[in-house]
Amino acid sequence: MDYSYDEDLDELCPVCGDKVSGYHYGLLTCESCKGFFKRTVQNNKHYTCTESQSCKIDKTQRKRCPFCRFQKCLTVGMRLEAVRADRMRGGRNKFGPMYKRDRALKQQKKAQIRANGFKLETGPPVGVPPPPPPPPDYMLPHGLHASEPKGLASGPPAGPLGDFGAPALPMAVPSAHGPLAGYLYPAFPGRAIKSEYPEPYASPPQPGPPYGYPEPFSGGPGVPELILQLLQLEPDEDQVRARIVGCLQEPAKGRPDQPAPFSLLCRMADQTFISIVDWARRCMVFKELEVADQMTLLQNCWSELLVFDHIYRQIQHGKEGSILLVTGQEVELTTVAAQAGSLLHSLVLRAQELVLQLHALQLDRQEFVCLKFLILFSLDVKFLNNHSLVKEAQEKANAALLDYTLCHYPHCGDKFQQLLLCLVEVRALSMQAKEYLYHKHLGNEMPRNNLLIEMLQAKQT
């Protein structure tokens, strides 16, 4: 469905620079790019580029290379899922509220620009110190600033690396069990995953859990019991960071050279996902499900959980000119723009827009843990053996989030609905991220034994 926009915003089509005619397929675009995108998707067209897949797309040359034009449509954020498959006029109605929300945010941003000169793509923060000398086994790519997070030493963490000590992820599990088997299955298959660490997770048993968990949260009045329990399940961020850094500092076997920046990012994402799997295994309801249901749920939402983890880290980071990695290092947006390539750069900027939306909504930690729980128990899942238990978990989480927002943010009566709309954008972002990863995989650019690619392949089989 198309939506009008306000003329005073002076928007130009992000694909070709022509005058915008309205909201089309998730974005303000011109009429020409709207029609081109719709025809391409509905007719399942496949284009090729006769040049180097980097043709300039503007108002005068937009018809010259349909391949690069369509890639630019996807890069700037036009959404495949918004195009109707039945060839009827109008997009999918479910995107209407998101368009209206986006329009309101653009109006708000326009007012901010007029009042404060605020822009998303600001330069690096003033006074950022130069990066310190990197540790010997973990070279920092150019453009990364190694900060000193609280509780994280500059060198490798003291003591054994424990469950995440191996730099290369163990993939020696039966393919029939899927890529998560080594991280989910306890010693005896067919049992639900216990909250304790299973035997395959670490060869020598170690005393105590690998992560420190905070003291029970005293939320005071108006904090539902479910949210209190979820807060207690959140791992200590400093210990997670130290464990991931320690893993990255260990050189991979057979690869004495320093890894490329993209390979490092993939390993960071792998280790972050392993910590997310551990969190899921400790969650109420999830640990009561059969292993098959647990794997189905995680295979459905793994990319959304990773994206949402990144988004919340940026909200805590609070700097528009850089992004914060899970290792505590800062990457300037100017570095991303110069070195990351157009697809990854567009992903980062789209994520930054969502960071701004959630920051404007004043997302707090209580809402974050509840939304993460909702993502884990997404009802957009088929072939579950215990669908009723998952449905009950989602209903309880929805009720807890609604009660919390009404109690603590009474001045923003629709905050609950706005937060759920943001989850739609998280899913769209995760879909674009998976397409990017698979594109890199087809180009043989992904590191070996990458868990994320195995997750992608498991989803397709």
Curated annotation (Swiss-Prot):
A zinc finger (NR C4-type) spans 13-33, 49-73. Adrenal, ovary, testis, placenta, adipocyte, and brain. There is a cross-link at K119, K194 (Glycyl lysine isopeptide (Lys-Gly) (interchain with G-Cter in SUMO)). The keyword Phosphoprotein applies. Residues 222-459 form the NR LBD domain. Keywords: Acetylation, Activator, DNA-binding, Isopeptide bond, Lipid-binding, Metal-binding, Nucleus, Phosphoprotein, Receptor, Transcription, Transcription regulation, Ubl conjugation, Zinc, Zinc-finger. Gene3D superfamilies: Erythroid Transcription Factor GATA-1, subunit A, Retinoid X Receptor. SUPFAM superfamilies: Glucocorticoid receptor-like (DNA-binding domain), Nuclear receptor ligand-binding domain. Residues 116-158 are annotated as: Disordered. Binds DNA as a monomer. Part of a complex consisting of SFPQ, NONO and NR5A1. Interacts with NR0B2. Interacts with DGKQ and CDK7. Binds to and activated by HIPK3. This is Steroidogenic factor 1. It comes from Bos taurus (Bovine). The gene is NR5A1.
